Amino acid sequence: MSESVWNGFQHPVPENGIVEVLGHAKILKRILLALILVVATSAASSAFAGGLTMVPEGNRHAEQPKIPGASVRRTRAGRTTFDDKYEKIRDLLASDKKLIAKVRSTAADYGIDPIHMIGAIVGEHTYNVDAYDRLQTYYVKAAAYAGNSFRFGYGDESIQQFLDRPEFSKCGDFADSYKLWTCREGVWEKSFRGRSVGGTSFPDNRFSAVFFQPFYAGQTFGLGQVNPLTALMLSDMVARTSGYPKLDENKAAAVYDAIMDPDKSLAYMAASIRRSIDDYKSIAGMDISRNPGITATLYNTGGSPQRAAALAARGGLPEENYYGWLVNDKLAELKSLL
């Protein structure tokens, strides 16, 4: 590179002008950095103004990410395989035209592509539970739970007594069920999880596992395998969109009816997917609506606001887990069910 280009001006560098040249170089560097910043900012602004970053279809991973040991052990204990379980739920969906019609209708109500719901159903019944030969089994179980008398709580403390503790007073400002229960879950994590408070020792476990699973830990039910806390969070959206009654944490049987009745369960499933898509748009600036593997991953993991925030902080595109990978890998076959 010539001297005249090096110093940024159309003059040769004098022998004793090294300091001056270095000064010019620093100025040039600042100007270039400023220009780069302006260009980058403009590009980001244009991209945001023109829409969101569209997450493309397909898997980011060439091979399926590792399946958790718990899922492997459950499947092995059931003397079956993941391939067998996948084929079982696929065949159930293929043979139940009424269910597919309900999936399509519910998806339309929530403004999502029905393939997202198919992906969530397939993922749940491949990795978490076995599919039932007949959908009516869910109706029978729903009726059985509705007839039982039980409550949400921990030990002798009901959920209502627990929420009356002063630590939860700040959550009283939220009227929307999603914001309200997200706040309460945050208080649990910060002030109670794994701690001894007011003479009670609380487990180092999730809020939903400690207070909202009166039968056994890891409890989810119904076609969409929704847990009670998730249903309570989505209650307002489902009430507005589908017209089902709002849920009350003090009426546990009604909550279980909502997540086990197939029709109601579909509404909560769709609401959960809708929430994940909205969270990634508003928090991470990402449109994940064309990648069922990503929405399936979030349906499996939960925590879409936290995950969207983490993605926004680190940059890049979201990646599917083992559960979402299967959905994308089988996408053509799953789309044929619709």
Regions found by a protein language model. Name each.
Residues 49-104, 129-158, 163, 251-261:
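N-terminal export signals and maturation junctions of secreted/periplasmic proteins
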Residues 112-119, 288-298:
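Alpha-helical scaffolds flanking conserved acidic
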